[in-house]
Amino acid sequence: QDRYLYAWVRDKDGNEFAFFVPKDEEVEQRACTFVNESKYDVPSLVPHTSSTGGMLSDLIVNRFQYAITSGREMYRMINEKMRMSKSTIFNWLRHGAEFLENCQETIKQWLLKPGSTIYCDESWVDTKVTDANGEVHYKKRYMWVIVNLTTKVCYYLYGSRKKEVIKEFLGDFKGTLMTDAYAAYLYFNKLKDCTHVCCWSHVRRLFVSASRDYKDTLAQAFIDLIGILYKVEVENQVLGRTEKEIVKHRGEESLPVLHDLYQQATALLKQFETNKIKLSAKLQQALTYMTKHWEELMAYTKIGSVLIDNNCCERAVRPFTNLRKNFGGFSSEQGARVTATFLTFVETCKLMAMAPLDFFRGFFDMIVAGRRDYALMTEALLVKPV
């Protein structure tokens, strides 16, 4: 008590605390000077958080575009003289996603534009769930990814792998659907106004695996023929052919190759069934897969707006698999849905050739300003399809 001056202080928010000032007989004692806070701009915060729109946007982009983990984010903030817990980061992201969810209906309308082509794929993730008995454990869940290159939209949908998930989302979609041959998609073969097309890249992978992993020399002939199909597609893109020209060249150049593929496949399977030749298990799988879904694999030749494969969608899945690799899984289903929301807008911005950071900053600036007309906000920030 002889060495320090003691003071009890109450701040403007009502918080009370004590501080000690060392006594110095040689230093002139002066009264405290209080700062006039009205002279400074008070930062505008995103509702339900202590974050500005710019800071929240940085957190979103770092996590969902660059796959930076929470631990690395915390160390980054320490370097900037800031300290923040993981729970605070998660809560801010959750509140930010709650605002963005209101824009997803507009994105979905653009995605399912009648007459357009959508590409669909899915990938697994381990998610912590609580069952009916209250027991907590990890279960395998799926992230469905749907891409529309015409409207430049990407949509992430979290759920199980049951066909009801994608069936309910797509509804009675009128257009063309490109997928692999997973059984959940076969439902769309029954829809009158929906053309289901299967991906040739999946077929090629099976033959490549039979050749490389199983050393089956018979697979190489099919790989070479599929390569000719891709050569035609490269020429279509390089020469900038119209949809009518694409259909014409596919009919003239691709159809003969396709007929050759089918004849060779059925002939090999027939010889195998009569024990005349031996086939590796992987080549059997490839031949059966191709012949079983031949109608869907042939369908692309008649539609000039459809690509030969689903690779554009698989590229959109990759950011999610990077997250899965870095984070290991989701600690809650709510966290999985938050991820789906943010990835939808990150990948849509990339398809539209705009920076995701600019979109999020613009969006949260509107939120802070009090706007809640989400459809108009989405149209103002993104490129609305014609």
Predicted regions span which residues?
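Catalytic center-proximal scaffold of phosphoryl-transfer enzymes
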Residues: Q1-V386
